[in-house]
């Protein structure tokens, strides 16, 4: 299972100076990055699951937070509970097709043997 992956978007109010994830310009590009990464997992044939690292962006005012979790756009929602709709839509588009995609990749792999 793949855990704690994310892509940060510069189109947010956060500086994105912490955390190890990739950085892209827009929330739509975050969605494309999610799709690209998960398609690779499905194609590999050896991944049983995955989950996005954070539900909500890092809170830059959080006391005692780990230094890697201070000011980055890692969530599906911002700190005012607004959904990053382009990201969520891209996730939904892939997730509702995950089993069909896994089957398709399996068939392609079997056809190439």
Regions found by a protein language model. Give the residues of each.
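Active-site clefts of carbohydrate-active enzymes
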Residues: 1-36, 53
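Short, flexible coil/linker segments at or flanking structured domains
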Residues: 35-38, 64
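Acidic-histidine catalytic/liganding microenvironments
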Residues: 44
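Conserved, mostly hydrophobic/aromatic
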Residues: 50
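Aromatic-rich peripheral "rim/lid" segments of glycoside hydrolase catalytic domains that contact
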Residues: 53-113
